[in-house]
């Protein structure tokens, strides 16, 4: 029963305890530094600590129990490191999780189907045209006032430090506008802290926004009771007019959480495409050969306890039309302007 920021400390300690569990697991089970040993180590790490195995089996039919035998057939004692990497990365790719990666000196194993398999619904050239050349910059926020007195803010990342002062300056500058467009397209995440600081500017009351759970054992269903997550209204300037938040499939991780937190705010409309998802808080471990593996460790849900791992639907579905693109028009921005000017 606390806000997201105050729960971060608990999360950190939870992850510290979680890391100790992983460490003790590795000490108990030693794997050889050969192709079979590295595959078995990777399979075991995911089997005991990845948080979406049952959900992925239910939704996309991934049965992790059969993956070890399936991919062991592709191993040989004479295979190169590059060949071993391809096999291990392919096994991880079955999970279809952008937070699951295999890191080696020569490559990063990944599955980016959460946005690569869908229309982009975004044009950097068009966004640059709407921003013009005289826009202002406050940390990761680019902003200006459009000719119809609509504020336009681009937030392309939560990886750059974003402070309360930055956000207050932006909202103060745009305070005379009739409405606000917050363009989150292509924002693939970063810090949950920065995402929450921005979300707090769109609520005037404490709101339940979701839940988080933690692994408590090695079983696929071994989780703690879900803990509620809240956002508190900011003590700084809060936006008191209508706002449209633009999304596409590249909205991932912390941005997915941001959309969860602001969707349902009385004055906020989410417009665009379903987000890419990525609701598991990531954690890292290591294989016998030194390669690092990242995976989702703690599942997060929305306020109705729905999974958001595969993304969040917008309030208004909207796609960038090729006809508009050819004419130098961003369909989503224009639809947002029309809505805000009604």
Segments predicted by a language model, with ranges:
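Bacterial Sec-dependent N-terminal signal peptides
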Residues: 1-32
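A generic structural signal for short, non-catalytic loop/turn and secondary-structure boundary residues
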Residues: 2-3, 15, 136, 146, ...
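Polar/charged alpha-helical tracts
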Residues: 6, 69, 124, 128, ...
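Acidic-histidine catalytic/liganding microenvironments
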Residues: 7, 177, 265
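Generic anion/oxyanion-binding catalytic loop in active/binding sites
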Residues: 14, 73, 325
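Alpha-helix termination/capping residues and helix-transition junctions
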Residues: 19, 174-176, 237
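Flexible, low-complexity junctional segments that flank or bridge functional domains
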Residues: 25-214, 220-228, 242, 284, ...
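C-terminal "post-core" interaction segments
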Residues: 26-47, 82, 150, 188-342
């Amino acid at each position: 029963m606390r806000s997201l920021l105050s729960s971060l400390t608990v999360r950190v300690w939870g992850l510290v305890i979680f890391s100790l569990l992983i460490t003790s697991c590795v000490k108990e089970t030693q794997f050889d530094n050969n192709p079979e040993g590295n595959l078995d180590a990777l399979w075991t790490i995911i089997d005991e600590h990845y948080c979406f195995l049952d959900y992925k089996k239910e939704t996309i039919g991934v049965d992790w129990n059969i993956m070890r035998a399936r991919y062991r057939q592709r191993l040989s004692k004479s295979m190169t490191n590059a060949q071993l990497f391809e096999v291990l990365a392919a096994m991880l790719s079955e999970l279809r999780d952008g937070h699951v990666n295999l890191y080696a000196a020569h490559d990063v194993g990944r599955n980016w189907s959460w946005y690569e398999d869908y229309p982009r619904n975004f044009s950097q050239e068009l966004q640059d045209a709407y921003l013009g050349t005289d826009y202002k910059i406050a940390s990761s926020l680019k902003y200006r006032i459009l000719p119809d007195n609509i504020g336009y803010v681009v937030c392309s990342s939560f990886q750059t430090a974003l402070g309360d002062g930055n956000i207050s300056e932006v909202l103060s500058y745009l305070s005379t506008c009739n409405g606000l467009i917050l363009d989150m397209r292509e924002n693939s995440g970063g810090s949950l802290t920065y995402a929450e600081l921005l979300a707090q500017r769109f609520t005037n009351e404490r709101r339940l926004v979701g839940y988080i759970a933690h692994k408590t054992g090695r079983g696929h269903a071994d989780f703690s009771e879900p803990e509620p997550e809240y956002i508190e209204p900011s003590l700084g300037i809060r936006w008191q007019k209508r706002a449209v938040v633009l999304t596409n499939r590249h909205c991932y991780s912390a941005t997915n959480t941001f959309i969860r937190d602001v969707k349902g705010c009385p004055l906020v409309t989410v417009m665009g495409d379903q987000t890419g998802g990525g609701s598991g808080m990531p954690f890292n471990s290591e294989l016998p050969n030194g390669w690092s593996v990242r995976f989702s460790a703690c599942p997060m849900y929305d306020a109705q306890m729905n999974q958001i791992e595969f993304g969040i639907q917008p309030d208004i579905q909207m796609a960038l039309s090729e006809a508009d693109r050819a004419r130098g028009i961003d369909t989503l921005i224009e639809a947002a302007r029309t809505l805000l000017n009604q």
